[in-house]
Amino acid sequence: MKKIAVIGTGYVGLVSGTCFAEIGNKVVCCDIDESKIRSLKNGVIPIYEPGLADLVEKNVLDQRLTFTNDIPSAIRASDIIYIAVGTPMSKTGEADLTYVKAAAKTIGEHLNGYKVIVNKSTVPVGTGKLVQSIVQKASKGRYSFDVVSNPEFLREGSAIHDTMNMERAVIGSTSHKAAAIIEELHQPFHAPVIKTNLESAEMIKYAANAFLATKISFINDIANICERVGADVSKVADGVGLDSRIGRKFLKAGIGFGGSCFPKDTTALLQIAKSAGYPFKLIEAVIETNEKQRVHIVDKLLTVMGSVKGRTISVLGLAFKPNTNDVRSAPALDIIPMLQQLGAHVKAYDPIAIPEASAILGEQVEYYTDVYAAMEDTDACLILTDWPEVKEMELVKVKTLLKQPVIIDGRNLFSLEEMQAAGYIYHSIGRPAVRGTEPSDKYFPGLPLEELAKDLGSVNL
């Protein structure tokens, strides 16, 4: 059994700490945020993640998991210290290491013996050595320690499963002793272990996320071409993805990636490349495609409706993906303001992310936790998040709620055949449009194309 302190009780810290406790370690999760620790002690989990609340409760009852604001005491009582604080994107696009530096300084000031200090946060190449120098200076060389990079690869919405069934453990360190300690810690996960130096471990996380983001932007560019040549991107993706060299994952066309990782990490990697004097044109294009994809779905809506001024639009999905309340870089946070700039009123649905989204979007949006209520008496519907409740909508019922049977689907949830049979005007991503049983100009008198371009050109992304 290892004694572990996890500094930072955000998404990564809380999930990692809880899973380390689950495999039999003594874990204390600590944070400077007193209200967050108070909530955790009272059994209130600050993030939504399937299975996390039950696992926290179980390990608290088994006395393997505790929470505290007393970070110095947690440091002194532990053998392994994980840094799992936020690394938000700075104004220049680089990762902001303010919290990492502060954690390293605190660790150095309270060392009382040999410790293994582990960076779990996603950090730029060179951060491990920076942490090492900060701890060394703050501790005044009184005690020995080692620094390890051990990046996380969990996905929001399936983080517990991803941690307990991890596909690999990456351990970066110049110390064989420290690497062996962290490798032993990961043995119960039965995952392949990759041992390397600090720099390579730090780069692995960025490279992995950038590659996945590249697959998403690639299939979205293919989807946009498919729309112009009459191809169906879902069939194209199937045909491409069955090639074992490529794989089917992350080849689902849509409105682009969001969340706390891909947008931040692709931008940070671009800055790392620039700092190293390398023009990373591929990642520049990945980011550009992702940003344009959000405008593309609004363009589709304008193509059907001519104008949304004075119209009410229902938006289904505020979280960046299902099974999370995370709205960081969520498509909805860009698309809803675009609709408002174009003069539309928005009724938005999300089962769990309304508190987080409303704090950003404000009170000009009507919010609903009932998917049907969000669509009642609206002129068109935009699907932005593939929540199960959206996938399972009764299309016959939806048609009675909408003023016009118009659905713009950013997640390709429905087959073209069922939408045609149900009589919808249905536009999705990278697939032929369904015109419905009535021409769209029955509902929307068309505007000249130059007017559509003028409307869309006025939108600020």
Swiss-Prot record:
EC number: 1.1.1.22
Entry's localization field: Cytoplasm
Modifications the protein undergoes after translation, according to the UniProt entry: Phosphorylated by YwqD and dephosphorylated by YwqE in vitro.
Regulation: Activated by phosphorylation; inhibited by dephosphorylation.
Induction of the gene: By phosphate starvation, via the PhoP/PhoR two-component regulatory system.
UniProt main location, coarse: cytoplasm
Function: Catalyzes the conversion of UDP-glucose into UDP-glucuronate, one of the precursors of teichuronic acid.
Protein name (record): UDP-glucose 6-dehydrogenase TuaD
